[in-house]
Every structure is written in C-alpha cells, then in structure tokens.
From Swiss-Prot:
Allosterically activated by ADP and other diphosphonucleosides, and allosterically inhibited by phosphoenolpyruvate. The active site is at D128 (proton acceptor). It comes from Teredinibacter turnerae (strain ATCC 39867 / T7901). One of its GO terms (cellular component) is 6-phosphofructokinase complex. Substrate binds at T126, I127, D128, R163, M170, G171, R172, E223, R244, H250, I251, Q252, R253. The keyword Nucleotide-binding applies. This is ATP-dependent 6-phosphofructokinase. Belongs to the phosphofructokinase type A (PFKA) family. ATP-dependent PFK group I subfamily. Prokaryotic clade 'B1' sub-subfamily. Catalyzes the phosphorylation of D-fructose 6-phosphate to fructose 1,6-bisphosphate by ATP, the first committing step of glycolysis. Keywords: Allosteric enzyme, ATP-binding, Cytoplasm, Glycolysis, Kinase, Magnesium, Metal-binding, Nucleotide-binding, Transferase. It holds the Pfam family PFK. One of its GO terms (molecular function) is identical protein binding. It catalyses: beta-D-fructose 6-phosphate + ATP = beta-D-fructose 1,6-bisphosphate + ADP + H(+). It is found in: Cytoplasm.
Length: 320
C-alpha cells in the first residue's frame, strides 16, 4: 500500500493544473496518505525542492491559472545519473509513488522513472490536446475559449477595415486547437499540420473569393507550419486586401480554467490516487467517452497515436 505520494507539474503550464494538484493532495489526505509537492517540475525533483502538502496548501487554487508548483524545462532528466539523484531525493522523503501532470515530454520522464522501478501516474496537462490515450487534455478547453475570444475581436476589426487576418495558434504538431477554434469562430480557413498545406492552391481559393466580393477573412493556422508574417505579405500581394498576421502566443496558456477543465482535472487527480492505492504504477490517465481510463504509459508513448478528426476540418471548411 502506498504511504506517501509526490506530485509535480512539468512542461508548458496549462489551466487546470492547480485543480489536478489540489485533487491529488486532498484525495491522498482523505485516505491518510502523505503527499508532497515538488516545485519546478523535474528540475525541482533533481534539486530536492520537495515540501509536504496539507489541505491548506491547495486552498483557493482550483480557480487559478498556471501552476503554483511551478514548472521548468529540464532536458538533462534524460540522463540516468540525473534520474538516479531524483529517485534518491524521493526516497529521502519516503515517497513511494509520483503523479506527473504534463504533456508527452513529461510522460517521457515518468516512463523513464517507471523503467527504473519507481511507480508513476501521468495526467495529461497541456493546451495542445496532443496526448495519446485521452479525448481531451487538462487546459485544452480553457485555451480554446481564449483563442475564440481573440478571434471574435479580430473579426470585429477585420470586418471594419476590410482586412484579412492570419492568426497563428498553438498546438505543436496537433491541429485540434486550430480546427475547433475555426469552427467556433466561423473562420474562413483552418490550416493544420495533419494535412499538407498547398500555399498556391490556398491563395488561388482566396483570390477567387475576393473576386466574388469577399472583403475580409480570418485564416487560422497552427504554429510551425510556415512564417505567418511572410504568408500575410503574400496574401496581400495576391488579393490586394490589407493583411495582418497575429501570433497569439503564450496568452493562450493563461487565465482561470473553465468549469470543464476544473472538473476534468479534479476527476483525473483523484483517479490517479485511486490507481496508486490499488497498486498501479506506470500508467497514464485519460478520458474517453466521458469515462476515466488508464493505459500503460510505455505503450501510450510508443504504440498509441492520437487520430486527427478529418470530419471536423471538413466541417470548418463547409461552414466557412
């Protein structure tokens, strides 16, 4: 039976991480299991930045964005000697299991610890919604609302000035945030990494629409596909309409989590503790068809893929 649990947040912050940590802490304490907060992710684990948590430690955190535990990039965690030091620090505090909240990079750290014999549970915390084994990640819907708000505002000014707006949206290699926000905002175009981007064909379609009287548009595009400032200049040259590029950037990560993210994170955090009490380790939690599930974390990273819903992209284009 697990006696003490550690919890950390890692990678890019996501709204709802605090709610997940709160659920881990209070569920563990409910079962008289000790719980320790690890500050600044895997870097803090390596540096022994570990403190005991009480119910009061997580009071008034469920509504806060970001992560009060902090996060940090720490690529050195790939080194076995670094992980051995991390496990040594966990043992010093008599912690015998770890809950990690983060994306697939954070899962990789949990996988490595699992392979070294230290039980871990991963919770999907990222606005990108790109983690295998779950329909939705903690923070995704809050980020979606943030993007929608920005697109609505850009629509106002674009229509007023007869302007095209090219909007770069986060997501890394996943186009979910782009597609869902395009549908929700009525954007004319959604360009995602899952589908090849034919720039010339896209410009031809845009020229045709402008030729038929279109005088403003919103173009949503996932980051890293192309230079949006260059694309905006080319659109302006090809269509004759003033075109501006907007990179939403890190504003997408901030803000108070939505009700959905608070509840999802709370369910997942509590479920992680239940799994550890049942003797599970090396698992990652997900939600599928609104039911909590868990998968082998190694299998999730190495063999599971997250299918892209082409039908949603088709819908975005049909409704544009």
């Amino acid at each position: 039976m697990v006696k003490n649990i550690g919890v950390l947040t890692s990678g890019g912050d996501a709204p709802g991480m605090n709610a997940a940590v709160r659920a881990v802490v209070r569920t563990a304490l409910h079962y008289d299991v000790g719980v320790y907060g690890i500050y600044n992710g895997y870097l803090g684990l390596y540096r022994n930045e570990i403190q005991p948590m009480t119910r009061r430690s997580v009071a008034d955190t469920i509504n806060r964005g970001g992560t009060f535990l902090g996060s940090a990039r720490f690529p050195e965690f790939k080194e076995e000697a670094v992980r051995e030091e991390a496990i040594k620090n966990l043992r010093k505090h008599e912690i015998d299991a770890l809950v990690v909240v983060g994306g697939d990079g954070s899962y990789m750290g949990a996988k490595k610890l699992t392979e070294m014999g230290f039980p871990c549970i991963g919770l999907p915390g990222t606005i990108d919604n790109d983690v295998a084994g779950t329909d939705y990640t903690i923070g995704y819907f809050t980020a979606l609302n943030t993007v929608l708000d920005a697109l609505d505002r850009l629509r106002d000014t674009s229509s007023s000035h007869k302007r095209i707006s090219v909007v770069e949206i986060m997501g890394r290699h996943c186009g979910d945030l782009t597609v869902w926000s395009a549908i929700g905002s009525g954007a004319e175009y959604a360009i995602v990494p899952e589908m090849p981007f034919d720039e010339d064909k896209f410009l031809e379609q845009l020229r045709d629409q402008v030729g038929h009287g279109k005088n403003h548009a919103i173009v949503c595009i996932t980051e890293k596909i192309t230079d949006v400032n260059r694309l905006a200049k080319r659109i302006e040259q090809e269509t004759g309409l003033e075109t501006r590029a907007t990179v939403l950037g890190h504003i997408q990560r901030g803000g108070a989590p939505t009700a959905f993210d608070r509840i999802l994170a709370s369910r997942m955090g509590a479920y992680a503790v239940e799994l550890l009490r049942q003797g599970y380790g090396g698992r990652c939690v997900g939600i599928q068809a609104n039911e909590l599930v868990h998968h082998d974390i190694i299998d999730a990273l190495e063999n599971m893929s997250r299918p892209f819903k082409d039908c949603l992209l088709d819908l975005a284009h049909r409704l544009a």
